[in-house]
Amino acid sequence: MNVLHLRAAYFMENNLAAISMIHGMGVFGNALLPDLKLPMIATRDVGDYAAQRLLDLDFSGKQARELLGERDLSMTEATAVIARGIGKPDLRYEQFPHDQVQQALTQMGVPPKVAALYIEMYKAINAGVVAAQEPRSRENTTPTSFEKFVQDVFAPAYHGKATTA
């Protein structure tokens, strides 16, 4: 059996969960370190890559491919792009304490055990335990920039004009 495992980076779409926070608190934040650079990928790029590989069937045995998005960004950098894209130049990123993030998740309806796993994930990302295993290359870099994602997906969702991607 031929299997290709795709290991996608941090989804750009994860940032959509902060829209209500931006509206309500005027800040963007989570438990990630502000200056830790992360590869961020649009889910559309993952789907496009998977579809192309299934059409080509150019893999054999068991293989893994990391998909790292267009470039690495820190949460501070991503917030600056979001700020420009939604017309809120003063928007800033704030790293929240783990206990506050866990409490917020459970208040949003996330089961406590799942919220605890999110905190474990944030801690592992911040510590470098969860990180890309391959260096960035032409093969694992995808086309959608964070600016394009904000323009096409985040800003319309923020302004209540979301369309299907």
Regions found by a protein language model. Name each.
Residues 1-92, 100-108, 112-114, 164-165:
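Oxidoreductase cofactor-interface core, primarily capturing Rossmann-like NAD(P)-dependent enzymes
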Residues 98-165:
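A hydrophobic C-terminal alpha-helical subdomain
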